[in-house]
Amino acid sequence: ALHGAADPQALLKQWHQSLQVGGFVMFSCLGPDSARELREIYQALGWPPAGHQLTDMHDWGDMLVETGFSEPVMDMERITLTYETPERLLQELRELGRNFHPARFGALRGRAWKKQLLQVLAQRLPRQADGRLALTLEVVYGHAFKAQPKIRVNALSAVSEQDMRAMLQGARSKS
């Protein structure tokens, strides 16, 4: 998953190298507002972060340009997932991936902690009109093209005396 890449800039460079000029890349990944309800609960309880920090769509656009892509277009949307129970919510979060945050709890948690987590989720997560628990995911969409390589122009150019004479003689013979 792109949002879990340890070095997204390196991944974009690989994509850029793999494409032909005129080719394009399209992607989607989770954005920083994903599971914000869960992060707020963890923070209120003084627990380590519930997930690693996700990259903002504007930063994705900047990385695309820095990598050599052109005409990046970025967009995002928020999707609300609903769950009948806290257990089902946790099951789906586990299926989506793992917590890459460097400050995450490094050991296994016990049954008492899980029981407390389930109770807190049932009490504090927002609920829909039908009583289902709600969790927001931000999905970032992007695409960009691989442009022609740019010609590097130096501030200082060198012309040999012989080339200069040839250019001057060519200009005189045309007049």
Predicted regions and their residues:
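Glycine-rich, phosphate-binding/catalytic loops in enzymes
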Residues: 13-15, 43-44, 161
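Conserved catalytic/acceptor-binding region of the Class I
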Residues: 22-88, 95-109
